[in-house]
Amino acid sequence: MAQYTKAMGTVRKYTPATLKRDGKPAFVYVYRHLQTGQVAYTQVPGVTEHHLNRQFKDPNWENKRPTMRQDLWRPMAVADFGDHQAACDAYDGLVYLRYKRTHDGKKDIKGWRKTNAAGNVWQDGQYRPVYTQEALADLSTVTEAVKVPVTIHWEDLWRRGAAESWPENADHSVLKRWDAIYPQSLEKRLAKEAKVPGETTAEQ
């Protein structure tokens, strides 16, 4: 991660120690923007200016800096890593892979993406599905890399795709319908089932 940190500054807002101090579970949240399909990663519920500043450093017309309106962000997946260091490493890895795709590997990635007749990233209105697809590929990559059991809670199992395409250390479940509306309740509910024994979330 040193290359990313040097180029972009501090990636994570929370360290393993601060997450434990604040009673936060070892989660990584994967949010999708309802209008554009863009994805933001967070360590606690909700998308903030910090996340947008770090994860959309050099926006362009195909990948504009998304709005921070909370009603437009929905949790696509919540990954429980069961270990705060693993969760922080996974978060850093997700942001780093995004950075590599949009900077160092930009030309190569462009050739892999579905494009329209003009050679631009395919879209339906403002929505570009490629961003959620790439986010899921990156989540699979970091899940395998951390080498600890991971439970991924999905907004819908069809987003996960085929279970056999995921690493062996990944288990899967489905979020409840109201989790997208009440993110703080989502954190508390999932924390009760979290993998780290003896750790619970602090009361909000």
UniProtKB/Swiss-Prot annotation:
Source superkingdom: Eukaryota
Keyword Ribosomal protein: yes
Subcellular location(s) per record: Nucleus; Mitochondrion
One biological process term in Gene Ontology: mitochondrial genome maintenance
Entry keyword annotation includes Transcription regulation: yes
Main location: nucleus
Gene Ontology CC entries for this record: mitochondrion; nucleus; ribonucleoprotein complex; ribosome
Signal peptide range in chain numbering: none
UniProtKB keywords: Mitochondrion, Nucleus, Ribonucleoprotein, Ribosomal protein, Transcription, Transcription regulation
GO MF annotation terms: DNA strand exchange activity; single-stranded DNA binding; structural constituent of ribosome
Family: Belongs to the mitochondrion-specific ribosomal protein mL67 family.
Function, in words: Transcription factor involved in regulation of RNA polymerase II-dependent transcription. Also involved in regulation of mitochondrial DNA recombination, maintenance and repair, and generation of homoplasmic cells.
This protein's name: Large ribosomal subunit protein mL67
Species: Yarrowia lipolytica (strain CLIB 122 / E 150)
The gene coding this protein: MHR1
